[in-house]
Amino acid sequence: HEPVNFFGVYRPEGETTILPSTWHETGIAFFGKVYKFDYELQLVAGLDPQNFRNTNWVGKGRQEAFEIDNFTSPAFVARLNYSGIRGLRIGGSFYYNQTAKNSSKPSRNIGHKFPVTIFTADAQYKSPKNTFIARANMVYGNLGEAASLSEINRKSPKATGYPTTDVAKNAVSYAGEAGYNIGSFFGEKAPRIYPFVRYEYYNPMEKAGYLKTPDA
C-alpha cells in the first residue's frame, strides 16, 4: 500500500506509532493552487481522547471509518505544498482539535478540552529520471491538559478496556532516507533497484504529561 512513498516494506514506524495509520475522517475539504503552491483546508471529525495512551500517543484515537462519527467537536486541518523547483517538493501541515467532546465517555471529561495540536513538515527530492531520491519528514504534537487526562486514565477500571496509562504532553517523530537506483548503471531498460539508508527517531512520550506527586 502506497509503496512509492517510502523505500521500506513497512510504513514509517514513527508516524504510524504516534498518529493514526490510514487516517481518513468524514468531513469537507477545500483545495486549490496559487502559483506554485498547492493548498488544502479541511473540517473533519476529530479524535476520541478515550484511546490516547503512552505507547501510541493519539495513534489509537481515530474514530472508526465507515461507522458513526462524533462530529460534536470537529478538527481543523491545513496543508501547503511548494513545488517551484524541479524535482523538489516541500510541504507542511497543521492540525487542531479540541477532543474532549468527541469522547465515547463524555461524562469523564466534563470541564476539560484536551486540545490536540500537530505540526508536520516534509520534503522530497527526485533527480532527473529518479536516479536519486531523498525524503525527510518531521511530526511534532502537543496535547493540552495531558496531566488531567493521564489522571483520568489511571482511575479507569481495567475491566472497561480503556487505557489506564499516562499520556504525553508532547510526542515527536523525525526521519530521513535516501536511495540510489543502481540499475541506472546498466541502461534505461534495466530494472530499478534502490539500495537505501534510513534514519528515524520517534518518542510517544517525548515530554510526560502526568501530575507530579510528592516523594514517598
Predicted segments with their positions:
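Outer-membrane beta-barrel pore domains
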Residues: 87-216
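Secondary-structure boundary elements
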Residues: 31-39, 47-49, 81-91, 125-132
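Extracellular/periplasmic catalytic domains that process cell-envelope and extracellular macromolecules
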Residues: 21-22, 83, 189
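Surface-exposed coil loops of outer-membrane beta-barrel proteins
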Residues: 1-79, 98-101, 107
